[in-house]
């Protein structure tokens, strides 16, 4: 059985890790390299590094920061934010990233998914989907881009299926409604996407307690759980989370 993964997320703006609620009201959470090292040492299975201002400011992710961070950790590392070409992907992989995450650029140019998948292998290509529930709808979500600022009107489930067909190797699924709230993952959203694709789904947005993480694996059928606020705020440690999940017989890599 493939091990379920715990993945700390480092949202970076202007060279610092930040975290907000529902994609707004950002607060400083520390230095990205220091946090990356801390989480790696604490037993993280992977890391995700997202430059959340890059697509809004129409610039590429900072290669230097990626390089410094990647050199400091020994675990797989995904980087995203403002990546809009095969050459940009190549630069980031050469700088030390193991995977790249595409979001706004993939919506704008879906061919980028297939081109990059052919060039580098689909194991390197993660498609980030920022999903927001439609007003007065329980089973419908729309895709947002530009750091959650722009509604594309695209149905999340249709888009998830399409990116898989185009060659995505993984989906990073963020519930904008749950982001930073620590009120629990959107289990219905996560399960709905996991049920229609055959690639791993990383659940993001809302983790606030041990039960939330267990539920997103057990009920949401996620392959990985992205963690931010509750780790940055030191509400829980990765050791505590892994111990809890292992006691409940989930296939988690033990803390070493």
UniProtKB/Swiss-Prot annotation:
Family annotation (SUPFAM superfamilies): Ribulose-phoshate binding barrel
Q: In the Enzyme Commission scheme, what number(s) does this protein have?
A: 4.3.2.10
Per the Swiss-Prot or TrEMBL record, the active site comprises 11, 130
What pathway does the UniProt record associate with this protein? Answer: Amino-acid biosynthesis; L-histidine biosynthesis; L-histidine from 5-phospho-alpha-D-ribose 1-diphosphate: step 5/9
Which Gene Ontology BP annotations are present? L-histidine biosynthetic process
Q: Where in the cell is it found?
A: Cytoplasm
What top-tier enzyme class does this entry carry? lyase
| Keywords in alphabetical order | Amino-acid biosynthesis, Cytoplasm, Histidine biosynthesis, Lyase
> Where does the secretion signal sit in this chain?
none
Q: Which residues cross the membrane?
A: none
Enumerate the GO terms in the molecular function aspect: imidazoleglycerol-phosphate synthase activity; lyase activity
Principal location: cytoplasm
Q: Which GO terms describe its cellular component?
A: cytoplasm
The answer to whether keyword Disulfide bond applies is no
- Report which reactions are catalysed by this protein: 5-[(5-phospho-1-deoxy-D-ribulos-1-ylimino)methylamino]-1-(5-phospho-beta-D-ribosyl)imidazole-4-carboxamide + L-glutamine = D-erythro-1-(imidazol-4-yl)glycerol 3-phosphate + 5-amino-1-(5-phospho-beta-D-ribosyl)imidazole-4-carboxamide + L-glutamate + H(+)
Task: Answer whether the UniProt record assigns the keyword Ion transport to this protein.
Answer: no
The domain of life is: Bacteria
Q: What does this protein do?
A: IGPS catalyzes the conversion of PRFAR and glutamine to IGP, AICAR and glutamate. The HisF subunit catalyzes the cyclization activity that produces IGP and AICAR from PRFAR using the ammonia provided by the HisH subunit.
Task: Tell me how this protein assembles.
Answer: Heterodimer of HisH and HisF.
Family of this protein? Belongs to the HisA/HisF family.
This chain's protein is named Imidazole glycerol phosphate synthase subunit HisF
Q: Which gene encodes it?
A: hisF
